[in-house]
Amino acid sequence: KDLFEQAGIEEVPTTFDQWTEAAEKISALSTAENPIYGSGLFYCYNGQNQSVIQRFGTDYMITGNEEDGFEANLLDNQAFADAMIWMKNLYDNGYNPQETDIDSMMAAGQIGLMTNGGWLKGTLDASGINYGIASLPTVTGEDQKEYALGDMSSFMITTSATDETAKAAEEFINWWMTGTGLEACETTQDVDYSNVTPNAEWSISMCYLNAYLPTVNSKEYQAVDVLVDLTPSETAQVQMFTAPGTLFYSDAASCQGDYVQDWVFNGPTDPTYDDVQDFFADYQADLEDYIADYYD
């Protein structure tokens, strides 16, 4: 927030064009002794890249379903091309660093805008910087509650767990979700939330978005404006790289980290839509190979 004030920016960007404008103004504050960047995108971090890319209006990297077949979705995709051009221009104009240690730079007051998750809150609080939390922009500035942003973590009990271990894990999960050991449920009906549950307390203290409806609908969670503003709708798509049902999620995610960095650092300057088509043809082929390997 201090960088925003020094740069004369009064409003939080709600569009990607406004992000660029803010990044330019904040980057102008940089000196040789104290480098400052207006934008802090992690070009190597798959999940955060995907969150940004989806806000441009594109779908999964790989679309379709098992019945009708899957297909790669990098080419002939205007929204994807727009996202890639925007990311690269931020870097080429000197508004976004190449470094991967964006967290430390943010904590040092050297980054104006960044994407991250609730796990960073403790670091930022400890640093003492004056910061705020807002939803990612969109192309038009309209909110897109239909996309879940960032990381939605889950508890799982593996098939290799012993009966004793599985039972202990189940008891912990029930306690975490309800605070009482009651069976976890999908609605708030018949559940006493007069006391804050461990799950809700953790979300509130970390400012971490929650997908468990009883927690989201609890009065404690609803009392935190920033959580309410950022929590996706109940019908939101979970942020993923590939359409549900694919068997190569991790391969596709790894591919994305490679191609975003390759494009940003090695792609042509002043890129066009056609440049994106030419550059990503090989990565489109890589994704098609994943599909063929798993389903042919």
Predicted regions and their residues:
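Extracytoplasmic/periplasmic substrate-binding proteins
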Residues: 44-51, 85-175
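Extracytoplasmic/periplasmic solute-binding protein
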Residues: 17-71, 111
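Short, solvent-exposed loop/beta-turn-alpha elements that line the ligand-binding surface or hinge
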Residues: 30-31, 59-82, 138-147, 239
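Conserved C-terminal helix/tail region of periplasmic/extracytoplasmic solute-binding proteins
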Residues: 5, 225-296
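Glycine-centered hinge/linker elements that transmit conformational signals in sensory
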Residues: 23-25, 67-99
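C-terminal lobe and pocket-closing loops
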Residues: 123-130, 142-149, 155-255
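Short helices/loops that flank or line small-molecule/ion binding pockets
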Residues: 4, 24-26, 100-114, 258, ...
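Bilobed periplasmic-binding protein-like "clamshell/Venus-flytrap" ligand-binding domains
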Residues: 28-44, 97-98, 181-190, 289-296
